[in-house]
Curated annotation (Swiss-Prot):
Subunit structure of this chain's protein: Interacts with DDX4, PIWIL1, RANBP9 and TDRD1.
GO cellular component: pi-body
Principal location class: cytoplasm
Free-text function comment from the UniProt entry: Plays a central role during spermatogenesis by repressing transposable elements and preventing their mobilization, which is essential for the germline integrity. Acts via the piRNA metabolic process, which mediates the repression of transposable elements during meiosis by forming complexes composed of piRNAs and Piwi proteins and governs the methylation and subsequent repression of transposons. Its association with pi-bodies suggests a participation in the primary piRNAs metabolic process.
Lineage of the organism: Eukaryota, Metazoa, Chordata, Craniata, Vertebrata
Record domain SAM: where: 272-334
Annotated region described as Disordered, given as residue ranges: 1-24
Keywords (A to Z) from UniProt: ANK repeat, Cytoplasm, Developmental protein, Differentiation, Meiosis, Phosphoprotein, Repeat, RNA-mediated gene silencing, Spermatogenesis
Name of the protein this chain belongs to: Ankyrin repeat, SAM and basic leucine zipper domain-containing protein 1
Organism of derivation: Loxodonta africana
Modified residues (Phosphoserine): S17, S18, S20
Length: 475
């Protein structure tokens, strides 16, 4: 044989399994000294050299062999053509050369197309994207399915390539096609845990309610395969990204969807479009997405919206029916608070000790509820930012609110300490009054302990909010 194989680092073959080394793809490197054809060779030897040149990606030798008469549609074991192999390893230049030499971009073997091979190739997303783009430019059909009825977009979604998915849809791929098990591209992405692909498919109009043959939606498939972030994302009441790009022309879609960051190693956590924030999520969940532009024009944040009074709704042009939806949602979201009722008129001399004690007990209980609420928030917060499913507002907004909370708690602590000192002063004066006869109740220090406990609770709440503030700043 004119080209001896020199064993070295392994190079991916064509994926076939063979019983003899002579029938399949060789794994290895060509001897560099034997790459030039110095004399005519038998066809069988040329085919072997051709396979090895494809294996090593030796484009110059491939071109030389094609010039010598080797067919660009040569059929190797299992019926694979050179283009099929080049696509399987995402060798962009080799795919380009073979296509320029007349290779059939629509070739298929047992319903396995070159395009499907490229979408499921071993390689980086950038390489796969370029190969797919080349094949589509030569009229490869993005909707031809394999024997399992899986289309190229399903393979791209399964393997986690959002830009390939976007390109296929831009070239006419059916985003909601289903395979033999009822899986769509969205179902495959949810099953494999590819959040960036899920977001991209939602932008492109994927229907998240389509069920598999066993009756499961993509969100249920994600939950079954232990992908809680995707499960939460797909469980939103409405889909704010659905159909976002359907009105664009093909050229506009390609231009927008193929815009990518120059950092190739970047984790595509979100799509190339800005992800939706907390205000959008709240509005879409209530079916009030039409209010998004209005609120943004008036620079109304979610926090502002949730604290608006009824007259403010009208001033900002919010319709009565929309007001009712927001107020109903606020009623559901509102944390039950302990109402103090009418505070005792402490200035009056006839105020009873029981009334005043009741007020202090309610204040202490309220502080306890607040401490529990903050503890729950700290427990539930993700430990790292990449675990957050939906985009948050600037962390500065959160830390500023925490700073206000800490300041208010410090003020509250200071006022409670003043109250404690005042009560203690009154108590001391009363004890020193020679005309005063202490009652049995006064002999017991339990009321004093309650006051001390209230003061300690308030101080503890202040410390807890300080820790919460540090946690937000660190995130």
């Amino acid at each position: 044989m004119a080209a001896a194989v020199q064993r070295g680092l392994p190079v991916a073959g064509g994926g076939e399994s063979s019983e003899s080394e002579d029938d399949g793809w060789e794994i290895g490197y060509l001897d560099r000294a034997s790459q030039k054809l110095t004399s005519p060779l038998p066809t069988e030897e040329k085919n072997e050299i051709f396979k090895k040149a494809l294996t090593t990606g030796d484009i110059s030798l491939v071109e030389e062999l094609l010039d010598s008469g080797i067919s660009v549609e040569s059929s190797f074991r299992y019926g694979w053509t050179p283009l099929m192999y080049a696509a399987s390893v995402a060798n962009v230049e080799l795919v380009r050369v073979l296509l320029d030499r007349g290779a059939n971009a629509s070739f298929e073997k047992d319903k396995h197309t070159v395009l499907i091979t490229a979408c499921s190739a071993r390689g980086s997303q950038e390489q796969i994207l370029k190969c797919v783009e080349l094949l589509l430019s030569r009229n490869a059909d993005p909707n031809v399915a394999c024997r399992r009825l899986m289309t190229p977009i399903m393979y791209a979604a399964r393997d986690g390539h959002p830009q390939v998915v976007a390109l296929l849809v831009a070239q006419g791929a059916e985003v909601n096609a289903q395979d033999e098990n009822g899986y769509t591209a969205l179902t495959w992405a949810a099953r494999q845990g590819h959040k960036n692909v899920v977001l991209k498919l939602l932008e492109l109009g994927a229907n998240k309610m389509l069920q598999t043959k066993d009756g499961k939606t993509p969100s249920e498939v994600a939950n079954k395969n232990k992908h809680p972030e995707i499960f939460s994302l797909l469980s939103l009441t409405l889909n704010p990204l659905e159909g976002k790009l359907q009105q664009l022309t093909k050229e506009e879609t390609i231009c927008k969807l193929l815009t990518t960051d120059s950092d190739k190693e970047k984790d595509y956590i979100f799509s190339s479009y800005a992800a939706f924030g907390d205000l959008e999520i709240f509005l879409y969940g209530l079916g009030l997405e039409h209010m998004t532009d209005l609120l943004k024009e008036r620079d109304i944040s979610l926090r502002h919206l949730l604290t608006m009074r009824k007259d403010e709704f009208s001033k900002n042009g919010i319709a009565s029916r929309d007001q009712q939806k927001i107020l109903a949602a606020l009623k559901e979201l509102a944390v039950e608070e302990i109402k103090f009722g009418e505070l005792p008129e402490v200035a009056k001399l006839e105020i009873s000790g029981d009334e005043f004690l009741s007020f202090l007990l309610k204040l202490n209980k309220q502080c306890g509820h607040l401490i529990t609420a903050v503890q729950n928030i700290i427990t539930e917060l993700p430990v790292s930012s990449h675990k957050i499913v939906l985009e948050w507002a600037s962390p500065q907004n959160f830390t500023s609110v925490c700073e206000e909370l800490v300041s208010n708690v410090e003020d509250l602590s200071e006022e409670v300490c003043k109250l404690k000192d005042l009560i203690q002063k009154l108590q001391n004066e009363r004890e020193n009054d020679p005309t005063h006869i202490p009652s049995v109740e006064e002999a017991s220090p339990w009321r004093s302990r309650i006051l001390k406990r209230t003061a300690v609770t308030v101080c503890g709440f202040g410390f807890l909010l300080f820790i919460c503030k540090l946690t937000f700043q660190r995130k």
